[in-house]
């Protein structure tokens, strides 16, 4: 590329035109300087240095054909763990996939420790429901909330519901599809959009699809090749050994690109993606997006755009989404044909490092690099947060002045001391100030 010199304010400024590639990809660049004495230097992110030490800048070439919906990133996102938000009705767990234990007292502590067999069953429920969320919409609107992000609401055997038992049904403890439609309709009246959590890398072991314990009448993959869902899973050998998310047997992994699965989740006339958008949802958050093939995510984006171009697709990615490599593949989340934006874990990581005593320069430089790397719609449409259901509460981290509890028994009863709580609250207020003034949608959990 040829650079043309020009005089500006007593300085020589060099300009050149670079033609970006025709297709989406990442481009790295630096400047090479040839001196009058025959020497050569390079200039990059780390300043003037030798050619073998230069750190190049990144240019993200992306497709801006599909615009990011204007409603996301302009207000507060409120994350709800449905079982623990608000209980409007008393319900019964009898006959539901489980087992389940229902707490009568909303203020009881959940069971955090493993059972006698060493298993964390997540089987105690408190009965929060969709009607309870609907009843608090005025309160949420008063907080400036414009997006409700709901953790999984579909039928499942655990309280977190990331072990989907049936994508077609709302978990009965939460209500039914009519309750969901009412929630979305009432939220829309208040300028609030509802985002669902899509768990499509794995299902539950206790599900219509896998049916390991035979709870459901239909044949699941665990019943053999005669099941319509058998090809969704990889057995080696059948029936006891199978691929599972991080080896957790309760979460058998699916073959995302199996045609019948793609049709069921994405491309069928009444696919899961389309059905729940028609029921009132305005977006999907993709759980463990780095476990999903790029092709699968792109199909979801295409189906959503076809159904309603004003919908938002968010990905759970814990690193810089433009440079992320998963399973030896550089991912394409933010190149314009997959997610609209990502959960901003790099923001939380850098902010936490600063609040725990690191230099402000690290936070500034990390966020500036993210701003340079991300397409503008993705940077300003990111979901920023201090804590989620997948992280320790930031208040606890900021308040700790002694080593954190290590065992589950210790964690089950741990509380910050009064002095640690006061320290944590002071730092948390500073964190909130940064969160609510940073580009993107601040998320409250």
Across the structure, where does each feature detected by a protein language model lie?
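Short alpha-helical segments and helix-capping/turn motifs at coil-helix boundaries
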Residues: 15, 61-66, 133-136, 298-300, ...
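The feature marks proteins involved in alpha-glucan
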Residues: 2-81, 85-115, 125
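Short, flexible loop/turn elements at secondary-structure junctions
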Residues: 5, 18-22, 35, 81-84, ...
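Active-site-proximal helices and loops of the catalytic beta/alpha 8
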Residues: 181-193, 201-202, 207-218, 272-274, ...
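Substrate-binding/active-site clefts of carbohydrate-active enzymes
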Residues: 81-146, 153-279, 300-307, 323-324
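Hydrophobic faces of well-ordered beta-strands that scaffold small-molecule active sites
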Residues: 76-78, 148-150, 194-196, 284, ...
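Active-site-proximal substrate-binding groove within the catalytic cores of carbohydrate-active enzymes
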Residues: 358-445
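Short amphipathic alpha-helices and their capping/turn segments at secondary-structure boundaries
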Residues: 66-70, 134-144, 184, 370-375, ...
